[in-house]
């Protein structure tokens, strides 16, 4: 998306190559006896299931806590608000299955989730949000994941006013979804092309989880669970891969 680099992994050491190169100077006999494999990875920080840090988007040159890029960002990342500052997240998780509430496997392209949609889904699920929840919305977009073009093209997502409801009224600590960008496009605000991101990250200090796999929770109708997830501690980074786990409460 947006010219982001692809994920790449390449083997820096192979069992056969180690015998030839002998990088540890152990000799042919030892290298033939003990095989060695190593690899390197290059990736964009927002690939796969990941969490956005509070420095990912800002407004008027400033991110969360009014930290300015000119003062706190360098060529090796931000010196403040990097994803390495996130502790392990252990909280009550809530799935809001908006697609299922509307009787659809997936919301229509470009559909913008409203507060009414969220309230309808919660009523159907017989669940109430609580302060400090990790709230995960399911537009159902993950069903297109294997088709990258379809997955990324005009996805349904969270509306700006619904995002404000989740934070200001419901008290969500983290907000996420199964789509690429959480929010729907085009923007509802002429002054901001990503208003949900800037509102959550720059104004409210609310991390965002994207590309969350929610299909199994939806299938099993697990709407409340213990959420546990820890991002990789990339110092100064604006996001990092996250491997979340949901433990049903019942």
Regions found by a protein language model. Name each.
Residues 1-250:
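Active-/binding-site microenvironments in catalytic and ligand-binding cores
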């Amino acid at each position: 998306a947006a010219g982001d680099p692809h994920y790449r992994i390449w083997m820096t050491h192979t069992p056969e190559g180690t015998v030839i190169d002998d990088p540890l100077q152990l000799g042919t006999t030892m290298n033939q006896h003990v095989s060695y494999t190593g690899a390197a990875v290059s990736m964009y920080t927002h690939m796969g299931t990941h969490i956005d840090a509070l420095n990912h988007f800002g407004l008027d040159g400033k991110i969360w806590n009014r930290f300015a890029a000119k003062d706190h960002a360098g060529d090796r990342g931000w010196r403040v608000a990097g994803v390495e500052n996130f502790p392990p997240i252990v909280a009550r998780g809530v799935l809001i299955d908006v697609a299922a509430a509307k009787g659809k496997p997936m919301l229509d392209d470009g559909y913008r989730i409203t507060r009414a949609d969220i309230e309808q889904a919660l009523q159907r699920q017989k669940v109430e949000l609580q302060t400090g929840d990790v709230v995960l919305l399911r537009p159902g977009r993950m069903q297109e994941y294997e088709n990258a073009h379809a997955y990324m093209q005009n996805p349904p997502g969270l509306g700006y006013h619904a995002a404000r409801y989740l934070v200001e009224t419901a008290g969500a600590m983290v907000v996420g979804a199964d789509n690429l960008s959480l929010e729907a496009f085009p923007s509802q605000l002429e002054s901001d092309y990503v208003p949900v991101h800037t509102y959550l990250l720059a104004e409210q200090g609310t991390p965002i989880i994207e590309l969350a796999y929610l299909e199994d929770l939806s299938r099993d109708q697990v709407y409340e669970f213990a959420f546990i997830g820890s991002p990789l501690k990339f110092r100064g980074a604006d996001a990092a891969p996250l491997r979340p786990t949901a433990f049903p409460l019942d």
